[in-house]
Regions:
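N-terminal intrinsically disordered/low-complexity leader segments
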Residues: 1-5
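Hydrophobic/aromatic residues within well-ordered alpha-helical segments
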Residues: 49, 60-64, 85, 89, ...
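C-terminal peripheral helix-coil segments that are non-catalytic and often amphipathic
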Residues: 91, 132, 136-140, 160-193
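Amphipathic alpha-helical segments used for helix-helix packing
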Residues: 93-118, 167-168
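Flexible coil/turn residues that form the inter-helical turn or adjacent wing/linker of helix-turn-helix
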Residues: 24-25, 147, 174
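Helix-turn-helix
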Residues: 9, 13, 17-51, 55
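Amphipathic alpha-helical packing segments from all-alpha helical-bundle domains
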Residues: 62, 69, 113-144, 153, ...
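Hydrophobic alpha-helical connector segments
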Residues: 55, 59, 69-95, 154-155, ...
């Protein structure tokens, strides 16, 4: 088994365990058992459970922003970009709602203790830089009022609004309604020229 394969097995097992249990309920023994990888090997790749969960969060968010950057590159039409990003979130939610549940669960659990709170704040700063790159790629946006706003602020606001709908529902054990996400797209489309 190659190193990448072992690391992927560990991450996949962690994804499944964190889906079923909270971060604090999950153990490295659970992950070792499910992945078939010995615990010392897990610690070789991930010195702590916090490091493992952080890597998992980072990979999920990185994939989201890579896809958003890909969408932005496909068209210069702002309204089309908005529609495509909202559609991407809807498809991701329908195909893999587990991703959002894990992100919400780990994020919430991390904020409960100082040691993990520091780690997640470092991670959010790193991810914010990825989001800024996508926002810079988005380019300046002219609002319907005529005011210009950076693509970074516009994209940040839209992603935050979509995330709020998704995570609020996930936290309540509900699946977000497609129409609620479409409304966010409509609001942002109406806000641009």
């Amino acid at each position: 088994m190659g190193n990448i394969n072992k690391k992927e097995k560990i991450l996949e097992a962690a994804r499944d365990i964190f889906f079923k249990k909270s971060f604090y309920e999950a153990t490295m023994d659970d992950i070792a058992l499910l992945s078939g990888v010995k615990k010392p090997t897990i610690y070789y790749y991930f010195p702590s459970k916090i490091d493992l969960a952080s890597q998992l969060l980072e990979l999920n968010v990185k994939k989201i922003f890579e896809k958003i950057s890909e969408i932005i590159s496909k068209t210069n039409n702002i309204k089309q970009r908005i529609k495509m990003i909202v559609d991407f979130y809807i498809n991701l939610l329908e195909e893999n709602s587990k991703t959002f549940i894990i992100m919400q669960r780990i994020g919430y659990d991390f904020m409960q203790k100082e040691d993990s709170k520091k780690k997640i704040n470092e991670l959010f700063e790193k991810l914010r830089k990825k989001q800024k790159k996508a926002g810079d790629l988005f380019g300046e946006v002219i609002l319907s009022s005529g005011k210009k706003v950076s693509g970074d602020i516009f994209l940040y606001s839209m992603v935050a609004a979509l995330g709020r709908i998704i995570f609020e529902n996930v936290a309540q054990g509900r699946k977000p309604k497609k129409n609620d996400l479409l409304v966010i797209g409509d609001i942002f489309s109406a806000s641009v020229k």
